[in-house]
Amino acid sequence: MLFDSHLHLDQLSDENIQQTLAHSKIIGMLAVSTNLNSAKKLLNLKQTYPKKLYIAAGFHPEQQLPSLEEQKKLFQWIDEHHSSISAIGEVGLPHYSKRENPNLDYVPYIELLERFILIAKKWDLPLNLHIVHNDVEIALELLQKHNIQRAHFHWFKTDEKSFQKFFSTPYFASLTPDILWNSKTQYVAQHLSLNRLMIETDSPWQHEGFERAGISEQLLAVLQKLAELKSLPLHSVQKQILLNTQQFYRL
């Protein structure tokens, strides 16, 4: 059985959404939101597929910051619907936007991330994070400042120094199909304990070599490569990864 721990389900076509949720090999998925409208759409979908679809509410950091009024509405919506969501996400820092625009002011993004951390703590919800490379240390400092125990770093990749700091925390990381060729993803897979790993597709993102592959095919490819890197039987890796995800998100 397969569980996708991070995807943008609301960005798929209606037909693809139905096919994905009806797939017999997919036992569940954690769908993250990019803004308030995204979260609302996911909640409507969840009401149709309550046993397979779990959702997260947040604001994707690789976009223009929401206005204070938009932030207020999003936080209010989370307060009103916290019992229906399984995580706060996707939230984090705009690493790729900063790469394109070195003058981007990070301060308001850090402040917004801290607000999301506080609301996650308020409702005892885990965080599904967009945090990579040199943003890892910033995020770890915020998480530890607020004594956060459940944080999931999606599509995790960073330098060795930041990885060592991450390694000493209780936090989880998830792997995408780029484990097949990305040395940084392979490093995470090899050095992080199996009981701190999850798998994901970040669908509808198209991974190299998987442009026509469905979600189940992508997840299975990640598991197979992970089993190879860990020198473990595929069935035991698959069982542990599913258990990790269910326990982390309290499903």
UniProtKB/Swiss-Prot annotation:
Keywords: Hydrolase, Metal-binding. InterPro entries: DNase_TatD-rel_CS, Metal_Hydrolase, TatD-like. Binds 2 divalent metal cations per subunit. One of its GO terms (molecular function) is metal ion binding. Its cofactor is a divalent metal cation. Gene3D superfamilies: Metal-dependent hydrolases. A divalent metal cation 1 binds at H6, H8, E90, D202. Coiled coil: none annotated. Its EC number is 3.1.-.-. PROSITE patterns: TATD_1, TATD_3. It is an enzyme of class 3 (hydrolase). PANTHER family: HYDROLASE OF PHP SUPERFAMILY-RELATED PROTEIN, HYDROLASE, TATD FAMILY. Belongs to the metallo-dependent hydrolases superfamily. TatD-type hydrolase family. This is Uncharacterized metal-dependent hydrolase HI_1664. It comes from Haemophilus influenzae (strain ATCC 51907 / DSM 11121 / KW20 / Rd).
